[in-house]
Amino acid sequence: MEGKDTKKKKKNIIIINDKGEMRSVAKKTLDSSESSLAQSKEVGEVDEVKGMETDAEKKDEPAMESKGCCKKCSNGDARGCHSERSGNYSEQPEKQEAADGEDSSKKESPREEQTPLLDKEEADEKTEENAKPSSEKKNDAFIPPILGTSMTVANKEIFEDRENGNTVVEGWMWKKRRIFSCFWHRKYFVLTREGILKYYKADGRRHPKGNWNMKDSTEIRHYNLPSEENSHPFRVLVFFPDFSFLLAFDDKNSKDYWVEKLNETIRRLKK
């Protein structure tokens, strides 16, 4: 009995560290009582090592998943991998830029005002008005006042020339007397298409005087004087070879209108 109890067994012992590496191998003679303890210790150490390996594998799984893209790319699927990712990322900025562009266009785009369309006749009239010279537009807008037909004492010749279209221009002007040159007299003047400039009394009475043929005139001068110091400051000087006379107006528009009509008639008659 003593021989069996004292019988010793030899057992190989493997020592493994925390990292799962085998450090050393030793042979040790154990008693039967010690062998059971060694076996239980070995089982505990093996279980501990397996648990550490399992924890290490769990830690490595995320890293392997992150490297999976690279492995896939290395196998020739790089185009598909990167294109899928780049496509998803590139679409989002483009959509965002498009949305920003629409918002900015809505905010910044000015409101368009629609102008009403003109009729053909109105458009033609505006075209004709734009084609006219500035002086003609001005004179069409202003016409000096003329003697009314209700003036029964007026010479009928005035109204007959007007009705027959023989009158170029008519109206009131101031004329300076030859003898008493310091005095002005208001007269009613008429310029006919034949170029005859004549005048009547202010109310159109009496026979016409003057009767100057503007075709024989040599020059027409006109100027403006300070209205504070001079009566009838808008003046016209008409020159003939042997004489001249002075006319005057109270407003510049009437003076300019008469000067233009006189010059037009003279040019037409001298052609």
From Swiss-Prot:
Residues 42-64, 92-120, 128-140 have a biased composition (Basic and acidic residues). This is PH domain-containing protein ECU06_0670. InterPro entries: PH-like_dom_sf (IPR011993), PH_domain (IPR001849). It holds the Pfam family PH. Residues 26-145 are annotated as: Disordered. Residues 166-267 form the PH domain. It comes from Encephalitozoon cuniculi (strain GB-M1). The lineage of its organism: Eukaryota, Fungi, Fungi incertae sedis, Microsporidia, Unikaryonidae.
